């Protein structure tokens, strides 16, 4: 099967733009082969939707995959591996600005962060971006069995591809119609109806679509991880030294990009109420906020607020901001953790819950997160009331005060995580792809 993927965030991020790469190497053939570059010039995605899709490609028997993603000033085409080619879409500054405002408006409404007053020019930029993606995807029409489009940034792509080819869409963020304005809710629903099949990550999202009057085919699948990809565990002592983690520290780990939606502030307020515990916040900015991405300062502003909060609560010596960590360092942090948190008020799923379980760690998860559907209180972890740092602190104490039960919960969690292993979910996804191929 030949699959063409579309997502905003690419599977690879460069530390130099295309002109910088040309200046460094002189001549680069297009497509640019990653194996010909120094490893310091790029990094493969270590989180989110791109990481999930990379693991899917590794574990599936796809004959060939083409992936279209946003890549400002990136090389036009990059060869990641023999069966994976990435094609980058670039936009002018004005279009990027309008696009960011519109898609962040959707994001904020979906997560209950803020209402968005739609501005026609911002929508136009969003539509242009989706059109450019669809144009690139349609170049592969005769050599594609199914298009696989991912997330809210690409809502219009299915309607543009239209009846020319089968298109499957996975919507990864929350869909709670009651917290969205009618215009945004209806825009999302009508856009989804242009796809042959829509996949959502949780039962709650599927129920939300039904309440909103969605007329189409929708399926629920839990996002997936490859447990083998989490087997890279770096030098634990080196990681402890790097992040000033002592042998007697109880490590409370929260893995996620620096984003107000992740509510790291709730974790900081909770840790102030838990003695002899060190909160490790692992992650940097999203593609939108990172250098080499869209370079907004959302992550930087949030970091400064979090650091100020830690100082005000006198816990700055017990809160560690790691910034970007490699897969090996992340594995070491999971190994060191006594408990892993997911604190978002609202989140589509939260794969870090399953990652923690792969390492047989107990979790404490906000009830507003999709992965809370898999948490059985007192059995594989605990849930807490969103934004209630007192409740979170009590649940963390329950884990730390009963080490034998914590070990048992981690073991049960590992069994739960098998429901989200790529080997099982990829079979379901392949069946969906095959079901829409009639259009070819």
Language model feature labels by segment:
Residues 332-337:
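Short alpha-helical donor nucleotide-sugar binding micro-motif in glycosyltransferases
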Residues 292-325:
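Nucleotide-activated donor-binding/catalytic signature segment of Leloir-type glycosyltransferases, i.e.
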Residues 345:
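Aromatic "clamp/platform" in nucleotide-sugar-dependent glycosyltransferases that forms part
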Residues 204, 224:
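Carbohydrate-associated surface elements
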Residues 353, 362-365:
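Short hydrophobic beta-strand element within catalytic cores of glycosyltransferases
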Residues 246-262, 268-271, 280-282:
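Conserved donor-binding/catalytic core segment of Leloir-type glycosyltransferases
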Residues 391, 398, 405-419, 431:
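A short, well-ordered alpha-helix in the C-terminal region of glycosyltransferases
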Residues 377-378, 382-389, 398-403:
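Conserved acidic donor-binding segment of nucleotide-sugar-dependent glycosyltransferases
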